[in-house]
Amino acid sequence: MTLKGVFLDLDTVGFQGDVKLRALEKVLSILRVFGVTPAEKVVENVSDAEVVILNKVKLTAEAIKRFPSVRLICVAATGVNNVDLAAAWEKGIGVSNVPAYSTMAMAQHVFALLLSLNQHLKEYEALMQQGAWKRAPQFTLLDYPIRELAGKRFGILGYGNTGKAVGRVAEAFGMSVLVAARNKDDKRPGRFPLEELLPQVDVLSIHVPLLPETRDLIGPKELTLLKPEAVLINCARGGIVDERALATMLRAGRLAGAAVDVLSEEPPLHGNPLLDPSIPNLIVTPHIAWTSREARQRVVQEMALNIAAFQNGELRNRVA
């Protein structure tokens, strides 16, 4: 069984030729590729494809009902919130995802952000550009205090693949790892209710998915529980942290710093409280934690395996 496929938004995975599609081309008789697909073009671009590959294109129930031939939807990501799973299920269309493809890339970015904050790299680079070192009366600059990570407490909210990988890196730096309990009934050793974990940690790293129950999970109350010398890192999803409350805390000096790779709207077409350049001790990156070339290539390889499994009547990484 050989299937016809379409990739609706290749530009979100790699548009400069650094990601190869050979693995997909081997398992599909035809692969049509679109760099981007606006909402009004989804049904037209899908056409007679039997396999639809997408990353961020939204597949609504209305669109799915109009697909004439689709048998499998392959999401080039772990989260599948942009696909109406109920509509796919009702029409007998399978849906697969790619879990854990960017685990190491994510862990790498978390610590790139943490180290940048901790070492005050932005601030010291600014001093260098201003010629401060040339004018210094001694061999070094001590304008911004640097703390060692060793001996500090690293809190993890969301202990899946990425949370575990981040924890291993934290331990390599000599940090103690504390994990937030999943719920009030989670009594496993080493797990702490969120309200008990927050006051203890020097770093809080967030790795939970964005769900109705996790939206604004870290709001004004939770931010106030953190120590003033604590640092918050969010490479999970925008919307988990109350962005306006975080901006307020940073301006007031109630937190030592924060770094986020995600915002509640991406791209932030309508602005965002965290994009104010006057906010101190804040780093914002444009959702790049997952984007190592290796991770993006791994997505392609894994989707090809998902399609091959489907052709063989097997279930692999199926969410519907």
Region annotations inferred by a language model:
Residues 1-49, 311:
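N-terminal glycine-/charge-rich "phosphate-binding" loop or analogous flexible N-terminal tail
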Residues 59-65, 176-178, 182-273:
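Rossmann-like adenosine-cofactor binding region
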Residues 76-77, 93-104, 181, 236:
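Short beta->alpha connector loops at strand-helix junctions that form conserved
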Residues 91, 99-153:
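Phosphate-binding beta-alpha-beta segment of Rossmann-like dinucleotide-binding domains, i.e.
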Residues 95, 229-320:
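Rossmann-like dinucleotide-binding domain for NAD(H)/NADP(H)
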Residues 156-157:
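Conserved N-terminal Rossmann-fold NAD(P)-binding element of oxidoreductases
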Residues 162:
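Hydrophobic/small residue at the entry helix of a nucleotide-binding pocket
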